[in-house]
Amino acid sequence: MHRNNERINLEKSNDWANTNEPSIACFLNSLARESQSVQLLWGEDGKRVYRLPLANSDSINIPLSYFSSLGSHEYCLPALLHTQDSIKTLSVEQLIEHIVNEPALVGIVSEAKKAIFTKRVLESHRNTEQAIEHSPYQEQLFTEQLDFKTAEQGLLIGHSFHPAPKSREQFSLSDAKLYSPELGGQFKLFWLSVEQSLLTSGSSADIHFNQRFEALVAHDPKLVEALQNAQQQGHELLPVHPWQWHVMVENPSIKGYIATKQIQNLGQLGATWYPTSSTRSLYAPGLPYMLKFSLSVKLTNSIRNLSLKECDSWNDLNDLFQHPQLAQQLGNGRGFQLMQEPAYIGLKDLNGKIIDESLVAFRDNPLMNNPAEEAVVLATLTQQNPYGGSSLVAARIEHYATQQHLSLHQAASLWFDAYCRHAVVPLFHLQANFGIVFLAHQQNIVMQLEQGFPVGMYYRDCQGTGYTDLAFKLFGEQLGDRKEALENYWNQDKVRRYFAYYLIINSTFNLISAICANLDVEESELIEILYHNLNALLQSGVKDDLCLRYVLTSEALCCKGNFFCYLQNFNENSIPDPAVIYFDLPNPLARVEEIAHV
């Protein structure tokens, strides 16, 4: 039997070991997912082929080294241009040029948008190639146990279904070397002494902001002294990302504050900080908090500035989880855990309004006392290996199989089932029984591993948190009664669209493909395990079963169209109706139920 998600012609695959460029795979896979014109065919030699039909009966053909029923294909580059009288290889630049100029593939696009898109895609490709070449960790990222810092800085590829997963327009190469995680960036923060009246801060869970701030600076005697000196002058300290400082000093209000010495830059002090996979969030081993900054860089689909409304909502979330009923849902050192964002601080302008570019949010660091713990962001576990070889998740499953004397097939099934129990089911449980929705994409899920096997997870980045009618029914006193006026009130349509996309398609389907591309297990087998875990939760009796039933039975799931969102130059965070960038993707979970009833 020829497997549906087979590693094609394994005995010949060594010749192709370095011909799959993961950044191009991300580009091609996002196009195939969104364009009905892309064809996935059987070639005459029995290999799968990715075919792009062009005008005049020409086509671009790319053999696959791995065909995924879920769309995470791997390729044998270079692409081949087939014309009536010749076959020639295409460079990456030529491949992209052919695609953006073919209306049958991408529709009618203005020349200006084509130029912007092409520039960003090629920039992302170059960034990825630089990361692969200059990462301080290299093949270690795909073979060894990783701590949190290394895993965060080991995300070389980025979003697996995006045409430009490593686009960051405002960074120069020298900026990237300092501030990008994949190049091993590390730096000290600028610390400002700021007149107290110019600052706004917030804190939650009945802990005063000053208490949190003192804990943050306690590691460095110079910072402690600087804080004491500032307070004696009626000032407080404000940490600032060094790159963002160059943006902030152009703000008219901040220029004025500097001139009047209401703001004084004390220089770079304290701990060394490491950018995590999001670039704007920073980690310093051994400190009680990570820091999430506004960073005025367009990363993939959006500019990454914080807002006061967001920061307040994260404080509210932390307060909400002080409720005994919710606190009981969280693991204590294992199981499902939250990296809350319990505090923030930022500058006000001359009119008393928050300067978004100055905001910084505190994020709990559960690894403070154990920075060597194997805590690996899901995106690093699942990314395609640019050095040739298997994904990290496959390597960790192989390690677990060896330790436990299991077959790879058994180990893969057990590993994925544990992922479902520690990540998928708890997130659905919170949605279905408490009305709390977390947008759990691959960079928000940090798997807690022991000897490579899941024993828990940390959910991080509370930006995509929503509350349904059920949450307002259960926690109305905490959430208030003006739900329709709240941006984070989610009706059922919104829950189905976003929650299912991020957790099931973005995270879990990609994990399935990353496991099955390298181990002796079918994608359909892991889809069945996912189905049975979700169905067990449904059968246990939940308060709101609509989203669970949608995921288990709907013929299609709502999927975000990153390729065309990016091609049309949308800022995802400012589209009036983000639903316009979503489309229907066939749902393999519904097929499990169909087969069960045959």
UniProtKB/Swiss-Prot annotation:
A molecular function (GO) term: transferase activity
EC category name: ligase
Pathway membership, UniProt: Siderophore biosynthesis; aerobactin biosynthesis
Keyword vocabulary terms for this entry: ATP-binding, Ligase, Nucleotide-binding, Transferase
Catalytically driven reaction(s): N(6)-acetyl-N(6)-hydroxy-L-lysine + citrate + ATP = N(2)-citryl-N(6)-acetyl-N(6)-hydroxy-L-lysine + AMP + diphosphate + H(+)
InterPro entries xref list: Aerobactin_biosyn_IucA/IucC_N (IPR007310), IucA/IucC-like_C (IPR022770), LucA/IucC-like (IPR037455)
Keyword Nucleotide-binding: yes
GO biological process: aerobactin biosynthetic process; siderophore biosynthetic process
E.C. number(s) listed in UniProt: 6.3.2.38
Purpose of the protein: Catalyzes the attachment of a first N-acetyl-N-hydroxylysine to a carboxylic group of citric acid to yield N-citryl-N-acetyl-N-hydroxylysine. Involved in the biosynthesis of the siderophore aerobactin which is a chelator that mediates the high-affinity iron transport systems induced under iron-stressed conditions.
Similarity comment: family membership: Belongs to the IucA/IucC family.
Protein name, entry field: N(2)-citryl-N(6)-acetyl-N(6)-hydroxylysine synthase
Lineage: Bacteria, Pseudomonadati, Pseudomonadota, Gammaproteobacteria, Vibrionales
